Structures are given as structure tokens and as C-alpha cells.
Amino acid sequence: MTLRKLLALSCLLLPMIASAHKFETNQRVPPVGIADRGELILDNDKFSYKSWNSAQLPGKVRIVQHIAGRTSAKEKNATLIEAIKAANLPHDKYQTTTIVNTDDAIPGSGMFVRSSLESNKKLYPWSQFIVDSNGIARKAWQLDEESSAIVVLDKDGRVQ
């Protein structure tokens, strides 16, 4: 599957996945910074976190996946994520950014959500995983609770 086909498929699915949002076509996503937890970093088999900001999004074509820290939200995007994996897109031009809202997780499951993210980071070290412990991105982007949203960005970080 080519990058162009993947982006076309994503754009077709976008209205079904993200109904309420604050995204505008050809604009950057509303600014958001996540300092509590933030981006999951894997360095020499050790995990750490660093602050993350949406200003870091330009530079590559991206699919930004924002999901509640719930299995039901993750399952909504499973078909698209499998298509991305199968497409074997070049890591120097494409990146998936997954923002997980652990503030919107089933009580007591946050530890399991973070463990799952760590496993995925080991499998897909080129992907970006962001832990949003306070639901900052969901609030800034006006997303539905207990759900997911997919946003396709061009290399300049503009919504497509």
C-alpha cells in the first residue's frame, strides 16, 4: 500500500472516527503541551519520559492517533493500524504518533496501559507514543471521552 493510498484511506475514515473535534483542514492542530509523563523514550532498553509538544509534529507525514486508555478505544483504530504496519512506510518520511489519554482509562488500569505502550515501543521503536495523564490533548482538541480520533498530517504538520 502506498503512502498516497494510505492517506486517502485515512481521510475517508476520518469523519467516521472523529466526530467532535477542533481540527481544521490545512491548519496545524491546536497547540498542546504534555509535561506530566509525555513522550515515552526507549534508550538502551530503559524507558523514560520527556515533555512533548504539538510543535514537534512537522517534519514527517503523520497519522496522529489520540485514544482513551481503554481497550474499546484502541480497537476502533485496529484496522487502520494494521494497514499502516502492512504498508511498511519509510521511517524517515512517515511516523505514527499515538497519544494515549490515561486520564480516560478504567480506574486502576493505568499501569497496564503504560505497560502495553512500553511493549509497543519495543516492537515499533520508530513510532512515537505519548502518555497524557491529565487529558490535556483531549480537552485542547475538544475530543469525545472514552473514544479515539485519527488525524492525518502532511510533512508541514497541517491537517489533511
What kind of region is each of these model predictions?
Residues M1-L7:
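Bacterial N-terminal signal peptides that target proteins for export
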Residues C11-S19:
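Hydrophobic h-region of N-terminal signal peptides that target proteins for export
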Residues A20-R28:
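Cleaved targeting-peptide boundary
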Residues P30, E146-A149:
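Short loop/turn microsegments at loop-to-beta-strand junctions
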Residues V32-V61:
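A short beta-strand-turn-helix
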Residues Q65-N120:
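Structural microenvironment flanking redox-active thiols in thiol-disulfide oxidoreductases
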Residues Q95-I99, M111-D144:
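Short, internal strand/loop/helix patches
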Residues S148-Q160:
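A short, hydrophobic beta-strand/beta-hairpin element that forms part of a small beta-sheet core
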